[in-house]
Amino acid sequence: MLIDQFGRKINYLRISVTQRCNFRCLYCMPKIPFDYQPKENLLSFEELFLFVKAAMDEGIEKIRITGGEPLLRKDLSIFIKMISDYKSDIDLAITTNGFLLKDFAKDLKNAGLKRLNISLDTLDHKKAKTLAQKDVLDSVLSGIDEALNLDLKVKLNTVALKNLNDDELISLLEFAKSKKAQIRFIEFMENTHAYGKLQGLKRDEIIQILSQKYQIQLIKKDEKAPVSIYKADDYEFGIIDPHSHEFCDSCNRIRLSAEGLLIPCLYFDEALSIKEAVRKGDIKAAVEILQEVLRNKPEKNKWSVVDNETSSRAFYQTGG
């Protein structure tokens, strides 16, 4: 079991397998990323798996594969199969923008993937092009349908933004309901490349908009995550509300970047590298680094909108 210095059980590992993305979403990535790592700096899937296997043995129970856009990493399904073959009951998921999902969903399911989160911020082609900086909506919708047709469990992630998609929240909820998928509205989280450029909606503002048509009722608050589950009449949806609800006291996660940085907190600059250890095959050293990262995990994150504080590390480097 992995326990940090504040008594929190750490059982959730988020792995960014690539910094690259085929979108340039306004809230995440600059038009021309300046800090992509060369391929030789990235851990191979075999090297990543050496650490992941040890982390599961130590107590990791949940793994999420992120990016950048994880489907841009060649042979991702092989990595998924490595993990699911080693521990078939691991809670294993992917977060994707869905653009390439129609082509890869079947391989991912065959490799052992059971669920995924797909970003969907708008149902309007013009807005989608504005947000992603390219024409993406038809491909994303096709990816959603393909995943659902394969009986993969799908959740839709929507970043709620003022003057961009605030007039679509009801239609997005109804779209998700029609697909029998849960939608989660996400409060915009300020980060290095988007600070001051966008304004997000807070939880109460999201509820106020949805209440124009539906009776909204809180039914579940997960203290292990920044998500609250609500009902709009008979449909359940989520709101991820890091602005409105601080969940640091029960944080259960750490992050691993594609180049091997083990990161204790999304909004914390300090990180330790496992690259040298795994490339030497030194699992004991990698586990010692894991334990040190837990000792370094802060009680609270450094995120402060008031003081204009965010981590200097961009979200596409750590998986958000």
Curated annotation (Swiss-Prot):
PROSITE patterns: MOAA_NIFB_PQQE, RADICAL_SAM. It catalyses: GTP + AH2 + S-adenosyl-L-methionine = (8S)-3',8-cyclo-7,8-dihydroguanosine 5'-triphosphate + 5'-deoxyadenosine + L-methionine + A + H(+). S-adenosyl-L-methionine binds at residues 27, 68, 119, 189. CDD domains: Radical_SAM, Twitch_MoaA. Binds 2 [4Fe-4S] clusters. Binds 1 [4Fe-4S] cluster coordinated with 3 cysteines and an exchangeable S-adenosyl-L-methionine and 1 [4Fe-4S] cluster coordinated with 3 cysteines and the GTP-derived substrate. [4Fe-4S] cluster 1 binds at residues 21, 25, 28. [4Fe-4S] cluster 2 binds at residues 248, 251, 265. Gene3D superfamilies: Aldolase class I. One of its GO terms (molecular function) is 4 iron, 4 sulfur cluster binding. Pathway: Cofactor biosynthesis; molybdopterin biosynthesis. Belongs to the radical SAM superfamily. MoaA family. This is GTP 3',8-cyclase. The gene is moaA.
